[in-house]
Curated annotation (Swiss-Prot):
Known outcome of mutating residue 145 to A: Maintains 24% activity using L5-SR as acceptor, whereas it has only 8% activity when CH5-SR acted as acceptor
Start-end of Low complexity biased regions: 272-338, 348-364
Listed result of changing residue 218 to A: Results in a severe reduction of transglycosylase activity
CDD domains: GH16_fungal_CRH1_transglycosylase (cd02183)
Span of the signal peptide: 1-19
Active site residues per record: 119 (nucleophile), 123 (proton donor)
Stored SUPFAM superfamilies: Concanavalin A-like lectins/glucanases
GO cellular component terms, A-Z: extracellular region; fungal-type cell wall; plasma membrane; side of membrane
Name of the protein: Crh-like protein 5
Effect of deleting the gene: Does not affect growth rate, germination or sporulation and displays only minor sensitivity to high concentrations of Congo Red, even when all crh family members are deleted.
Lipidation sites (GPI-like-anchor amidated glycine): 370
Species whose genome carries this gene: Aspergillus fumigatus (strain ATCC MYA-4609 / CBS 101355 / FGSC A1100 / Af293) (Neosartorya fumigata)
Length: 395
């Protein structure tokens, strides 16, 4: 009985450690440089061609391409191949055609993240063949643990599925192969104060949550210890498509509120002649975009079209499941030598130049610097949370 309650309590508290809690420059705390924008309404990448990586940064490990697309391989301790778009977009849609990595403890991740620690996630555990995880964070707030859900999907490690995040100022909708599995409305997220609403970039990566150097709770959440001798374990991404509701050359936070109303954007230009035939962007006229003036200006904000959001509840949708007590337990984190995305796809770093929040422990090092630095401090902090809960229950 004690174990039952301990497991349930840990399952509830573990998401506290899973948001990104570090940013190179957090606009909630100080004035930051503008974000480079996607100055087009759409962007597509066919990862069966190496040129599709032209608008991406390989921030950890190596990401080769092959017939099945970009390859994110975990073969040994510390492997956490990760790529980020080199641009941000502001409301719209992100579609990723992915086959998750197999292997107990191996995590495949699709993450949208912003500089002020807003985040929207997909995560697939290598040993879970029937479901995937959805999650979100606003402003790095990890004080509640009701954000994550598990939703059904068939054989994600054997089959390519299209994972979609449709993101507007009113709602976030997660879909698999065109079927909605979860909807989060603006008001569901603490009255909108924790709703993801600032310019995001897309991050893709895999890592070993089951690495033996990780905290016990992380390993349990990931499904168990990763057996590297049975690998390698590869996540494949065939293609990516992004719709940008507000094309712009750059996005600027006009104050420290972190609200979508505070975002100013500069210009929309036609960059349809992109780097290659397999990585292309298209610009169209939009009421959302400002003029091409170099002075940032607020313009009528556009949002992508989507189904009417559900009126209430943290998660809704025909296939969504409750987040109250997931079938696996544990937190997130990468190995102490690697970096990667996960439910803990957040950025963190030992650099003294960044800014951090007190919301929770960082789960990964700052990937934009291309570093695979140590995160012993952050995973230790998560482990302390687990220990504290267990101690209280034992008492």
């Amino acid at each position: 009985m004690y174990f039952k309650y301990t497991a349930a309590a840990l399952a509830a508290v573990l998401p506290l450690c899973s948001a990104q809690t570090w940013s190179k420059c957090n606009p909630l705390e100080k004035t930051c440089p503008p974000n480079k924008g996607l100055a087009a309404s759409t962007y597509t990448a066919d990862f069966t061609s190496a040129s599709a990586l032209d608008q991406w940064e390989v921030t950890a490990g190596k990401v080769p391409v092959g017939p099945q697309g970009a390859e994110f391989t975990v073969a040994k301790q510390g492997d956490a191949p990760t790529i980020d778009t080199d641009f941000y977009f502001f409301f719209g849609k992100a579609e990723v055609v992915m086959k998750a990595a197999p292997g107990t403890g191996v995590v495949s991740s699709i993450v949208l993240e912003s500089d002020d620690l807003d985040e929207v996630d997909w995560e697939v555990l290598g040993g879970d063949t029937t479901q995937v995880q959805t999650n979100y964070f606003g402003k790095g707030d990890t004080t509640t643990y009701d954000r994550g859900t598990y939703v059904p999907v068939a054989t994600p490690q054997e089959t390519f599925h299209t994972y979609t995040i449709d993101w507007t100022k009113d709602a976030v909708t997660w879909s698999i192969d065109g079927a909605v599995v979860r909807t989060l409305t603006y008001n569901d997220a603490k009255g909108g104060t924790r709703f993801p609403q600032t310019p995001m970039r897309l991050r893709l990566g895999s890592w070993a949550g089951g690495d033996p150097s990780n905290p016990k709770g992380t390993i349990e959440w990931a499904g168990g210890l990763t057996d590297y001798s049975a690998g390698p374990y590869t996540m494949y991404v065939k293609s990516v498509r992004i719709e940008n509701a507000n094309p712009a050359e750059s996005y600027t936070y006009s104050d420290n509120s972190g609200s979508w109303q505070s975002i100013k954007f500069d210009g929309s230009v036609d960059i349809s002649s992109s780097s290659s035939v397999t990585s292309s962007t298209t610009s169209t006229a939009s009421s959302a975009s400002s003029t091409s003036s170099k002075t940032p200006s607020t313009s009528t904000l556009a949002t992508s079209t989507k189904a009417t959001p559900t009126p209430s509840g943290t998660s809704s949708g025909s296939n969504s499941s409750s987040s109250a007590e997931p079938t696996t337990t544990g937190g997130t984190g990468s190995s102490n030598t690697g970096s990667g995305s996960g439910s803990g796809s957040g950025s963190g770093s030992s650099s003294s130049t960044g800014s951090s929040t007190s919301a929770g422990a960082s789960a990964t090092p700052e990937l934009s610097q291309g570093a695979a630095g140590s995160i012993k401090g952050s995973v230790t902090a998560c482990a302390l949370v687990f220990g504290a809960v267990a101690a209280v229950l034992a008492f």
